[in-house]
Amino acid sequence: MGETQRGQERSRKKRIVTAGLVLAMAVSFAGLGYVVFRKLSPGGYRDYTVQKEQYYVEYSEEYDYGEVITVEYPVLTGIDSVIQEQMNAQLYETAMDRVNYWHFHPSKAVKAFQAHQFTIFCSDVTSDVTYHSQYLLSVDFYELYSAGNPVWNTNITERGFNADLLTGEIYELTDILEINREFMDLWGACYCEQTGEEAWDEEELTLLLSWFLQEDEELKAVYESRPFFYVTENKEFVVGLSLDPVLYGAITYEPTSRILSTVVKPQELAPFKTGSEFWDRYEKSRAAGEVLPCEDKVKNIWLGEGAGIWNYF
């Protein structure tokens, strides 16, 4: 092979190697660009998954009283790993809220209550992922729990969880709405229309406002007022509060709900919107992600549908 031919061959190989490197770099940057776009794009997340799981224990014999606990909670995958870990921890804590209060992490006052009242603690929590878009996740936690003896000292409570998938921000009711006297007029009208109850009078609405703002000092001695909201699949809002017993209010002698909630249409909330980024996310939201049911979900033997306590009522 002559020098000229060998030179041409080397030149051809060099061009092939160079082209290969350029192609590899292009593919690499394209992949990186896809990942960055997927993580940071204003379009949000579309392919994430919410898998429901369950914490379950039945008479572990680790305590001076029996326990039957079935807590369903969502586990999120497919978004930024840091935000995902943070959000999953918050979802779990929200699901376990009353279990932590009465059972796992009791205060001194609750421990004293346990010593006099507990022969059993039961909790049954269901989680309903009511809305999931490329930006927002909204969950309704509904719980029955028995704190004391007999087991039909059952309280029914509810709480909402609303989060920004891009930033991890958790939205409370007062983050997105101005809760004032005019808002209570709207809320009261919606509540009475949907329940068929008589209209709330001025005194009742003023008292209710103090509950939503958590300003009723007399109430705090017996119940903790806990406002909540969540978004429905139709992008309407369920707005309400639950009165959770501090101590002896938990003695009910029958299943008792202290939940006050109603559906409010988004257009009716317009005068009360805050400047929260939630509203921009909400307006641009479209359904996204997938919710998977809890596998091998266990029914609570005392509080589940058709279970123990319902035999007494």
Which residues does each predicted region cover?
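Hydrophobic core
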Residues: M25-F29
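Compositionally biased intrinsically disordered regions enriched in Thr/Gly
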Residues: G2-V22, G33-F313
